[in-house]
């Protein structure tokens, strides 16, 4: 919430259990020290986040840079492609999307 995420945002999936091959991005590091790798630092993860907005809008965000590269795996017959197909199908329908209700006071996110 401290960086502008609306209060009704839902984390619908999160990665975890990363090895020490995964490290924080350089933007998150002020000073490098031991323990900033996947088995030690809880910040090393990718979250999928969903929230609704005004006028029946919504936002889906994948926290992984590899999300797009996973789509063509196995000829697009995989769980990431199915997830995206379900999202596009839901977002293309008329009417409200499922999820937490957006209220006008939340436009003051900061």
What are these regions (language model features)?
Residues 1-110:
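Extracellular ligand-binding/catalytic regions of CAZymes and related secreted enzymes
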């Amino acid at each position: 919430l401290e960086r502008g995420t609306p209060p009704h945002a839902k984390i619908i999936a999160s990665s975890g259990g990363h090895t020490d091959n995964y490290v924080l991005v350089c933007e998150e590091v002020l000073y490098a020290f031991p323990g900033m790798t996947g088995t030690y630092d809880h910040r090393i993860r990718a979250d999928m986040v969903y929230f609704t907005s005004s006028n029946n809008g919504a936002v889906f965000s994948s926290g992984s840079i590899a999300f797009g590269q996973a789509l063509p795996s196995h000829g697009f017959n995989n769980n990431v492609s199915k997830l995206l197909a379900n999202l596009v199908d839901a977002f293309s329908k008329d009417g409200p999307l499922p999820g937490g209700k957006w209220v006008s006071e939340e436009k003051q996110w900061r």
